Amino acid sequence: ARLLWIMAGNRPALRSLVRLLGLAYTRGDHKKALALGEQVLRLNPFDNHGMRHTLAEDYLGSGDADACLRIAAAFPDDPAPELRFNEALALFRLGRAKGAIDALKRAHQMSPRVAAFLLPGRVRKPQLSDLGVSLDGDDRAWLYRDAMREVWKQTPGALEWAKKMLG
């Protein structure tokens, strides 16, 4: 079954699932949250809620590089760092060096500001707007760093490798 966002009558059900997902995260039930996120993606494969970004981060953060790659592969044209930089890190974790290098360079081409925020040990937090996040600005790069730098740090050699590849 599909519940496409474009159909206004489907929106209450999709919103309810996303709210349940938020509650699962709040309660610390990440397994339930991941299952709900996957359900939202199955029902609405165009992913108007951006579940793909959350799922890619959470799968990689929990050590499931293959699941992160599955999500990234389903949205090959999405330039979001949550997909592209996480794809590179997932490939690096799996020891797929050539794919990791290609993915990292592609991620950097799509979101060139991310490396400037992700790779240094310390960076100044940019001004964040109450109105939203820019597609490829310092704010988006900062938010990616804030969400994922620890995951990069926990992957032995990943930050050093990325610095070398992008240096």
Q: Where do the protein language model's features map onto the residues?
A:
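Residue-level signature for tetratricopeptide repeat
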Residues: 16, 22-24, 56-58, 90-91, ...
